[in-house]
């Protein structure tokens, strides 16, 4: 069966039903439907070296979402270092990763399975963070998704979120289910439980059915992305810095926009009920 037809059938099952107006409840409902399909967490089922290319895994449990804006690999690093499109010309990276000398090749695969090769010509760092922005040699193909970020008022849609202080530092406590990739491009799920000084902390999910889809991070996962689900869309939150921790992209939104010379795309939460 054609890959796009299959994805359409799966998406209709997962997203075609009425979902809860509560954002977090809707995420859990969608996770349940996704887990009914498969336990296979691999985005890709195979790859070839000559010509270089990847085959999308039609059995991946998270295949209904659009992962085409996440890099399949980087020449010389494989799946290490991540790379997610935040504009047609820019990718989110991790500053501490020893990326190859510029220019280096980065690869993306669209939903039908075509591999695209670009060159990262320079990398800019966001001062005081582990965020780096790579510039591509040309605009990414329109068939590759550019990811949005959360709106500034996202916290008003998260029930149970609290804001406190510890040693004079603001600490946000919450339970926000997320999806994330590792260096093998496997999709796992966890919960953001704290935001401290512009960093998000991820732990195993409290949602019992999702616990089998959690995997702890390890060295080499750096730069790979973390997303939250907003309806049928993946919204980018950041990229792995160290085990269980990543820079919260919204904290550094202004600095990122200054580097890329444009505004980041913003997701729409207005269809959900505000709880705060």
Which residues does each PLM region occupy?
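Single-pass alpha-helical membrane anchors
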Residues: 1-15
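C-terminal subregion of chymotrypsin/trypsin-like serine protease catalytic domains
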Residues: 13-52, 85-97, 192-211, 215-276
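Conserved catalytic-core segment of clan PA serine endopeptidases
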Residues: 31, 99-163, 183-192
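A structural motif
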Residues: 51, 85, 91, 132-136, ...
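A conserved glycine-rich beta-strand in the N-terminal activation segment of trypsin-fold
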Residues: 59-94, 127, 223
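Residues that flank catalytic or metal-binding motifs in active/ligand-binding sites
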Residues: 87, 102, 128-132, 172-175, ...
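A short alpha-helix/helix-coil micro-patch that ends at or immediately precedes a cysteine
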Residues: 90-100, 140, 174-176, 180
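Flexible, gly/ser-rich surface segments that form the specificity/activation loops bordering the active-site cleft
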Residues: 162-209, 217-218
């Amino acid at each position: 069966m054609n890959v796009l037809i299959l994805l359409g059938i799966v998406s209709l099952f997962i997203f075609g039903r009425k979902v809860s107006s509560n954002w977090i409840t809707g995420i859990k409902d969608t996770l349940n439907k996704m887990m009914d399909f498969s336990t296979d967490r691999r985005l890709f089922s195979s790859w070839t070296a000559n010509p270089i290319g990847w085959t999308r895994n039609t059995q991946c449990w998270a295949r209904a979402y659009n992962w085409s804006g996440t890099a399949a690999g980087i020449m010389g690093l494989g799946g290490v270092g991540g790379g997610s499109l935040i504009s047609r010309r820019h990718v989110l990276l991790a500053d501490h990763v020893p990326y190859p000398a510029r220019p280096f090749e980065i690869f993306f695969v669209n939903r039908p399975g075509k591999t695209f090769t670009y060159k990262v010509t320079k990398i800019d760092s966001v001062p005081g963070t582990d965020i780096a922005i790579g510039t591509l040699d040309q605009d990414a193909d329109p068939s590759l998704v550019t990811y949005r970020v959360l709106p500034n008022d996202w916290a008003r849609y998260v029930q149970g979120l609290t804001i406190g202080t510890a040693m004079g530092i603001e600490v946000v406590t919450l339970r926000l289910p997320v999806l994330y990739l590792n260096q093998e491009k496997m999709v796992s799920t966890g919960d953001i439980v704290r935001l401290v000084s512009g960093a998000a902390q991820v732990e195993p999910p409290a949602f019992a059915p999702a616990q089998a889809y959690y995997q702890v991070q390890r060295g080499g996962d750096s730069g790979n992305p973390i997303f939250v689900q907003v309806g049928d869309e993946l919204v980018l939150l950041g990229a792995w810095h160290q085990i269980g921790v990543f820079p919260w992209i919204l904290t550094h939104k202004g600095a990122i926009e200054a580097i890329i010379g444009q505004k980041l795309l913003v997701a729409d939460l207005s269809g959900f009920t505000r709880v705060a």
